[in-house]
A protein has these predicted regions:
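Short glycine-enriched loop/turn motifs at secondary-structure junctions
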Residues: 1, 31, 50-52
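Short glycine-/aliphatic-rich beta-strand segments at the starts of folded cytosolic domains
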Residues: 1-8
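Conserved beta-strand core positions
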Residues: 4, 26-28, 54
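A generic secondary-structure micro-motif detector
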Residues: 7, 31-32
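Electropositive phosphate-/nucleotide-binding environments in soluble metabolic enzymes
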Residues: 8-11, 62
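Amphipathic alpha-helical interaction surfaces in cytosolic regulatory modules
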Residues: 12-27, 35-50, 70
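Short, ordered loop/turn segments at secondary-structure junctions
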Residues: 33-34, 61
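C-terminal structural segments of small proteins and small subunits
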Residues: 49-78
Length: 78
């Protein structure tokens, strides 16, 4: 299981990340230690506190991981 930390600054960011997650050949969950939602569920994000960094978790190959990190670079917490 891989995980990255992401953060969103607007509804548009959430929508774009949700669309990005839907294009992946693997499932992505986003949330906190306590609450997790499917990253393709735009409405699911509204059950989370998106003002704070969130953890995105997924299980994928090394190639898919590298490609996803490139595509999701804007959302990564540095």
């Amino acid at each position: 299981m891989r995980q990255i930390t992401v953060q969103f600054t607007s509804f548009r960011d959430i929508r774009e990340f949700s669309v990005l997650a839907a294009r992946q050949p693997f499932q992505i969950t986003v949330g906190t230690e306590k609450y997790k939602v499917n990253a393709t569920s735009f409405l699911g994000f509204f059950t989370l506190n998106c003002r704070r960094p969130l953890i995105a978790q997924f299980d994928c190959s090394e190639e898919d991981y590298a490609r996803f990190l490139e595509e999701a670079a804007y959302f990564l917490v540095k």
